[in-house]
Amino acid sequence: MLWWLAYIALGLFTGLFAGMLGIGGGLLMVPTLTMMFAAQAGFPATEVLHLALGTSMAAILFTSLASLRAHHQHQAVLWKVVGQITPGILAGTLIGTLFAGSVPSRPLALFFMVFVCVVAVQMILDLKPKASRELPGAFGVFGVGTCIGALSALVAIGGGSLTVPFLTWCNVRVQHAIGTSAAVGFPIAIGGSLGYIFNGWEHPGLPPWSVGYVYLPALLWLVPSSMLIAPLGARLAHRLPVATLKRLFAAILILLAAKMMWGLSV
């Protein structure tokens, strides 16, 4: 099979939804890449999930830059908050990737599936925290950043599904919460990518063209296609019913999680 075509298709699919809904592609990329890698020769069954996590995180490194730039141009990034939360984010991604590297694929996959289902339910029910407080002090922001970074690294996401609700809860305007979350996604991706590269460095049995747990052939096709289609998704967001799209996206996530569960049971 021409796997590069499958990688391009995945990049287009995730980029389209990322542009329409402002959601990073990690939740779609990880389960799909896991299935793709498992179907190819040369990929050890015990490492396909780690390779999917690392490759997805590396892809987010590039896509988050484009998102950050766009939100900065619209003056939607609170750079003071980014500066306060980044040290905790970096510490958290280090913890998360080290933990992920030491956990076998099965419990890691179960954790990922639970997280995906929680996000899907949140999207279907459109649950949003009520603004009820101000941002915590430096120590509190560091602690929150550490938690966001660790969880984001464990499931290879840019952190938007965690950062935006937190900032909204702290009385940050939605536009600024989304823009700031996009900026926070960059240090998450840096720390997460380096962590997965380090954890998989010289790991025996990984396929050729792997840099740690990052599989370069998939990355090289995923990134351009997802970045190419994302602007179209953003334009479609103003023409299509966003609430319906979110429910469709959530249904796809649940189906992918179910497919991963079925794969673990056979």
Give the positions of each predicted feature:
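Membrane-embedded alpha-helical segments of transport systems
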Residues: T55-T63, A91, A183-G195
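An active-site-proximal beta-strand-loop segment
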Residues: T180
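Juxtamembrane transmembrane-helix boundary motif
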Residues: M1-L21, L28-H50, S64-A150, L154, ...
